């Protein structure tokens, strides 16, 4: 195979390559076996025509196109590997020469990854708003939330206040006409929770059990039901009950109810503090990592990012998101119906920062290459086991799905991120 690659820009070029006679013969054999099944010739049963007779009647050239289709993918991949390039999109392939008895010559217009000129990526100074410190107030807030979760709702005769729960029947209408989904009975609603349309809950503050009130609201302009968006509505609402939270005593007994692993309130507070310290430390490290990566990307220079890479990233992100939804039992159709959005909306959402994601990946890849990381078999095995546990899949299935080269690439990317983050200094 003869291969050459000539760049026409930083991200485009022409790949010229040939297909040798032995490979062509293999392709012709495959092509003949495929097309002969549909050929009927007097003196032969359908599909039983000999190769010699076929060539005599139609000429071997009649098989060229099918033969090329059979061998082109492998030949193109081999040419790409020999040229040492990384195409990022489907090529536009043209046949330069296709004659009987000669090697076939082809050209492919390819889009390749852009050149990345790295700047500083180690020992970067970054600023982050996150902190690892845990205040007494944060511990008390966690404790209060746990106390609220164990509160009992007790019926009260007095007027509803913010934070109370009202049990209501309601019928909604727009211009005097009831609409689908606008009716409910014995619905429990915590006032101030923001569960209902803005303005609804506020109008129930001060009501008592047995009262019926008219609640007037306006649906938000971006409301998921387009026929209601921006319209004024009237909800005739009957308050059946008003309930107030009765908080349990904050003592050792409650501490044991909240967490069976502790014996006292002080032990619970200490445990909450430790958990908060761990979560804040993780958030802090994530913030440092993000800031350091952004700085490393800003220090690098990439002349041009091909549109094809942007499109590929958008579709990759969309497929990953929708695939995650399907794992939760939500089909794409169901997701778009629930959210009141469309595939175009999701495309625009991921398109907004696709350039940043592609640019970041390119810089991290370049850093991994500059550091010349090596990956051991033990690291690959550990990565496979980690992924198997993460996605609840057998190790053998992960091994079949993910090529070793891809796993090594991902491990190298993680090592590059670690270099950027662990050497960074916070102002």
Curated annotation (Swiss-Prot):
Family matches, as PROSITE patterns: FKBP_PPIASE
This protein's UniProt keywords: Cell cycle, Cell division, Chaperone, Cytoplasm, Isomerase, Rotamase
One term of GO molecular function: peptidyl-prolyl cis-trans isomerase activity
One Pfam family of this chain: Trigger_N
Location relative to the cell: Cytoplasm
Lineage top rank: taxon: Bacteria
Function: Involved in protein export. Acts as a chaperone by maintaining the newly synthesized protein in an open conformation. Functions as a peptidyl-prolyl cis-trans isomerase.
Domain remark from Swiss-Prot or TrEMBL: Consists of 3 domains; the N-terminus binds the ribosome, the middle domain has PPIase activity, while the C-terminus has intrinsic chaperone activity on its own.
Record's protein name: Trigger factor
Organism listed in the record: Lactococcus lactis subsp. lactis (strain IL1403) (Streptococcus lactis)
